[in-house]
Design a protein with these regions (language model features):
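Acidic, divalent-metal-binding catalytic cores of TOPRIM
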Residues: 1-332
Length: 332
């Protein structure tokens, strides 16, 4: 009997269970996410909206399988069972920008009970440019601004933007054999980043992107008007040349862009602080004690990124926030 109840768990079932609770007890809203990594992210979001009347419980879609991803959340017999007591939370990937071209895109964009990131994935939020300096401070305990992260990510986005439009265009055409997501990411990667001259790696990327653009524009000259129309459409959806990094594959932005610049910056900030400790120490024992204390206070930058919530100030996040507020308004 318990097994059948689990298999048939739905928004209506949870609603019925809520009604059996004492009047002052808070109602539970189950929020299914794609993987373990998503649990903390969505918990930090829903915590801002909970009150004395209800709370969210963030869960994986199955306790019998390690299956991950959007398909597991939406297609594992959950779609028809979602409602005011059960919601799904997914990374948008390209589905937000595909605007209903695929069945998954339609389901994500049209369902009132599916919350999407709008940014490609949670990693994009974790790499929100305006929060990167603070992340470095938390990781190194050094507030020296070595790099203008906002300017760097803006320039990166401006370079990637025209090729990004083509990448989504190929997805809409369902022609990934010619220009896949992997192909696109290979052109907008960063090579070794210099803390003193971070723009150099962007210049190398700019050269790769422009060469590929010339090739695509020549091969698909009939699509140029459609490409220009997509730029206008994307502007309406919130995608601009300045924030394109928020809509590029999240893992790529984290590993091949943000970490490429954050790692050398954090290393430099730590060395700077260590040199300061060495300079101010009156003797070797004090130096060793202070250095040990400092090292114990350090945090890996990738861990800091996963915990920071500076992205909540981003315009892209405001779209998700609006969806949650409208959902809560409907169920009250």
């Amino acid at each position: 009997m318990g097994k059948r109840l689990t298999e048939n768990l739905s928004s209506l079932y949870i609603g019925a269970a809520n009604r059996l609770k004492p009047k002052k007890a808070r109602n539970r809203i189950v929020a299914y996410v794609e993987s373990y990594d998503d649990v903390a992210f969505w918990r930090s979001i829903f915590a801002d909206f909970e009150d004395e009347n209800f709370y969210f419980e963030v869960m994986l879609p199955s306790n019998k399988s390690l299956c991950k991803g959007k398909k597991s959340v939406l297609m594992n017999k959950l779609g028809s069972r979602l409602g005011q007591n059960m919601v799904a939370c997914v990374d948008s990937d390209y589905d937000y920008l595909l605007q209903g071209v695929t069945s998954t895109s339609r389901q994500i964009n049209e369902s009132r009970y599916v919350f999407q990131t709008y940014a490609y994935a949670i990693e994009n939020y974790q790499c929100y440019a305006e929060s990167l300096h603070e992340a470095c401070v938390l990781a190194t305990l050094n507030d020296h601004p070595l790099v203008d992260f906002v300017g760097f990510m803006t320039m990166y986005s401006q370079i990637a933007y025209p090729l990004f439009i083509w990448s989504v265009w190929f997805y809409r055409q369902r022609n990934l054999s010619e220009f896949s997501l992997f192909d696109f990411c290979s052109f907008v990667r960063l090579d070794k980043v210099s803390v003193r001259q971070p723009e150099e790696c962007l210049m190398a990327m700019d050269k790769r992107v422009k060469n590929k653009l010339r090739e695509l524009e020549k091969r698909h000259s009939r699509a140029l008007d459609e490409i220009e129309a997509m730029k206008a459409e994307f502007a309406y959806l919130g995608v601009t040349p300045e924030n394109t990094y928020m809509f590029i594959q999240g893992h790529h932005i984290m590993e091949s862009v943000a970490m490429k610049i954050l790692t050398p910056v954090c290393n430099a900030l730590r060395r700077e602080r260590e040199e300061e400790i060495k300079r101010l120490a009156e003797h070797h024992t004090q130096f060793r004690n202070e250095l040990t204390c400092y090292e114990r206070s350090l945090l890996p930058i990738d861990v800091v990124l996963k915990k920071q919530t500076g992205f909540k100030e981003s315009p892209v996040y405001k779209k998700l926030e609006k969806d949650i507020r409208e959902f809560l308004k409907r169920i009250k």
